[in-house]
Amino acid sequence: QDYLPEDVIARQNVIDAIRRVYERYGFVPIDTPVLEHFETLTGAAGNEVNKEIFTLETPEGEPAAMRFDLTVPFARIVSQYREEIKLPFRRYHIGPVFRADKPGPGRFRQFTQCDIDIAGARSLAADAEVIAVLCEAMRAVGTAEDGVPLFRIRISNRLLVDALLGGNGITETERMKHTLRVIDKLQKVGIDNVKQELGNGRIDDSGDPIPGVYLPETVISAIAEFIGVCGASRMETVTQLQTKLPVSDSTAAALSDMQELAALLDALGISEAEAIFDPSLTRGLDYYTGPVFEIEVVGMPSIGSI
C-alpha cells in the first residue's frame, strides 16, 4: 500500500487520536524491532499463523522472521526485562506488522496495529478496562453518528468453547484447534458451511476440497446451537448459554467470568450497542486462554475485524 500526502495526514490523525486516549488511561509506549528471532515468533502462534509468517535468514545464517503481531514481541519484552518492568505493566505499541497471507478485501500483508495490554493483572477488571479504552478510542476517531456507534466489539471467552468441546468428548489438542478454526469462520462462510466442515468437509467455490473435523452429528448440532446464541443483552446471552453447555465445573467457571465481565461493562457505561457477547468468536491463536474480543465496523463487513 502506498500512501499519498492526504492519506498520510488522515491516517496520522487517526493514530494520534488513539494514542491520546491510550495515554489518558495511563498506558506507556514501547517499541520492538520488526525482525525477531524465528523461534520467538513461532513458539506461541500455532500452526495456522506460522504459515503466515514472513521468514528470512540473517547474513550469519540464523533464521529470522517479521513480526505478525505486537503481542508476541510484548511477551518477549516482559520476559526479557522482568527485573526492570513493574507489574501490572500498562503498555501501548503502535506499529506495522506483516503476514504472508493471501491479500483480499480487508486483508493486507502489511498493516498497522494499535495495541494495548495490561501485563500482570489477573482480574477481569483489566479486560473490562481494555474494552472501555477501545470504545473510547473508536469514539475519538469519529466512529459514531448522532450518538449511534458505527463500531461493535464482539466478546467471547475461550473457556466457554473449551467447556463445550470438553463436555462433548473433544479433548485431543489438534482436533480442538481445528474445531475452533472452523467455528471462527462463521461470519465469513455461514452456518451451513461451518457444519459441513465440522463434519466430513466440503468443496469450496473454487472446487478445492476443505478437510473436515469429522465430529459426530450430535456434537455438530450442539456446537451450532451454542454459536447461534444471541441475547438482547450481554447478561441475557449468558443466561441462554447456560442451556447450551454441559453441566461441569469448567462451564460454571466460564459462565461466572462472563457474568462478571457483563457487570463490569455495565458499570463502565459501555452500551449494549458498543459491545456484545458473541460465542462464535473463538480466534485461532493458541495463546488465547480467557476473554477474547475484536472490533468490527457496523455495516462494512468487507473491512473485516479491526
Which residues does each predicted region cover?
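Short acidic/polar active-site loop segments enriched in Thr and Asp
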Residues: V28, F151
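Acidic, His- and aromatic-enriched active-site or binding-groove loops in soluble protein domains
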Residues: K51-P59, G169-I203, V297-M300
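Short, highly charged C-terminal tails/helix-capping segments
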Residues: R154-L164
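Positively charged, Gly/Ser-enriched RNA/tRNA-binding surfaces
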Residues: I9-Y25, E36-E39, E60-G61, T71-E84, ...
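Polyanion/phosphate-binding surface patch
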Residues: I30-A64, R107
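Auxiliary tRNA-acceptor-end handling modules of aminoacyl-tRNA synthetases
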Residues: D2-V8
